[in-house]
Structures are given as C-alpha cells and as structure tokens.
Amino acid sequence: MYAFKKKYFLIIESIKDLDLRNIKIHNKFNVIYRNFNKSENIDGIKKFRNQCKLKQIKFFIANDTKLAVAVKADGLYISAFDKNLKSLHYIKSNFSIIGSAHNMKEIKLKILQGCNYILLSKLFKVDYDDKAPHLGIIKFNIFCNKTSKNLVALGGIKIEKLNYLKDVNCNSIAILSELKKKPA
C-alpha cells in the first residue's frame, strides 16, 4: 500500500520535463522550475505557468526572484547553497517561499529566510552519487520532530521506495529523478 501525502513537489529542470496532462488531481501538486538551462525563453515559461494555473498547480521558480516576478510565479524556491536573507521582504506579498536543506543548521537558516516548506535532502540513497550521505527514515523523523516547519522528503524517492514513505513523518514529498525517466 502506497503512502498518500497532502502535497507533492515536482522538481523540473526544463518545462519540457513534465506533461501537465498527466496530472489529474488538483491542489496537491507544486512544480519547482530549476532554471539551470537559461535557453528557455520567458514566453515559454509564462505559457507553462498559465497551464499550471489552469490545472490549479502551484508554480515556483528556483533562485531567481526577477524571473519569478516576471512570470507571476506562486513563489520562490531557495536552494541550500543560497544563504542570503534578502528573500525576507517577499513574505508580505502573496509569494510562498520554499527552501532546501541538508542538516539542522540549514533548516534554521531556511526558517530565517521565511520558508513555508523546507525540502530536506537526501532521504534515501541516490543513484547518481553512491557515496553521498543520506538521512534515512529515522533521522528524517527526528528532524521533523525538532522543527515546527513543514519538512518535505526529497532524495532517492523511487517507485520501489514508495511503500517506505508511510513511515516518514511528513505531509509532503518532492521528486526529481523519477520525473526524468521515460514511461515503459
């Protein structure tokens, strides 16, 4: 039996990575667009953002406040390496702020940055880096108990690991690499 969560965060690196027609449930999904590939034009991103709005999918831009404002995104995603506190003034507007962290020190920084949700990484071992440390379910749950913020499980979440998510003490999960796989 799979564990159902209140929110799902889908992290994409290109607007071509996700076909929104496959999302049937409204108000549960959030798309985080990591604009590493600067070749996508702003009009294409605006069109994708409008498609998200029609499907009631929240759309976030990673690490680029100017682009987030330009495309009228629902909010901003702040990576773990961004230690800047400038994002605080966006709290008063209708922007939501999502952050990313790997340890308790970074979680505290994301709270100072005004994050509504904090993606805590890596929950499970990841394929792309065998030696990278991962938290595991027990340590992740300890972090959840130490903070009042909404922590989101990220990292190593694959189809075969979905059953383990019922033991994770959080309401949301984030998926990156599973989105890139081609359907069978």
Describe every region a protein language model picked out.
Residues 11-24, 63-66, 102-109, 158-163:
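Short, acidic/polar
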Residues 17, 27-91:
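N-terminal active-site wall of soluble small-molecule enzyme domains
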Residues 31, 68, 110, 118, ...:
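Conserved, mostly hydrophobic/aromatic
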Residues 44-60, 83, 87-103, 133-156:
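Alpha-helix-loop-beta-strand connector modules within alpha/beta enzyme cores
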Residues 76-88, 117-134, 156-184:
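Glycine-rich phosphate-binding active-site loops on the catalytic face of alpha/beta enzymes
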Residues 94-127, 132:
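Internal catalytic-core helix/loop-beta-alpha segment
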